[in-house]
Amino acid sequence: MFVEKRKAGKNIKYFLVHSYRENGKVRKIRKYLGQNLGKEELKETKDKAKKHVLGILQELKTEVFLFTLTKNQINKLNKYENKIKIMHFDSREWQRFTEEFVFNTNAIEGSTVQREEVPDILHKPKAEGAEEIETKGVAKAVDYIKKTKEDLSIELIKKLHEICFNGSKSFAGQLRSVEVAVVDSKGEVLHRGVSVSDLHLALKDMISWYKENKQKFRPLVLAAIIHNQFEYIHPFQDGNGRVGRLLLNLILLKSKYPPLNITLENRAEYYRTLQEYQKNQNLKPTVEFLVKQYKKTITKVTTKQGKV
């Protein structure tokens, strides 16, 4: 910030000026201080004006964990929701969605269960083996987020993990006590989860941010932020992807939006959007990707026989 002096006839007018960058353009906030001010009077009015300018700046941007978004950037992200159709599923469509979601979310993580096997597994009285347990578990978790009145919390996050993996993983429902990393097929580290010592605080910060800022963002953008930040934290030893995609849908359902499905065939693009968020704090690719997935979900679920 700096003081700008302007001559106006025989008078000198003073302004406090602050420059900032938004979307590659330099913008200015200019606050009038007065005219013909003495040294002490200028200092006093400058200090008051500085607080006012800082307040304006605070309103213009929102902290989003490791980065900030300006009001203009938030508005642009929120407009992506105009590209999706808001509708409500009937019981048959919910069944179709659940089967599609269960298959894809597990397959993304390496499950060998085929799409056509899912209905039979869900109707079996008892699951056989870890993959069938997780098939039934994820379906139960979908039903849970559909019905629950609970809002986002650490306990809810742990509950979803327990529902998905009870019987298949010894640590179901428990936050990890070991360090974790996401590696690619070559064994190269793509992302390291938050350290164990910071894990609980990171989750608390995520939930506090959600409660404080959820009115600023449209549901799809809000869901994208929480999903990406959850994956950044990586609070479980395993199963973070599936719980993250459930949380994404929990937030959508809380806002009376239909759920969406991220498909196996789009896994590579999905991972790229996460990398953009984690490495470059760029949320736009995720929101654009989710819009496309939303359209595919609606078509798949509402078309007769679930065929596109």
Predicted features, each with a name:
Residues M1-D238, R242-V308:
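FIC/Doc superfamily catalytic core
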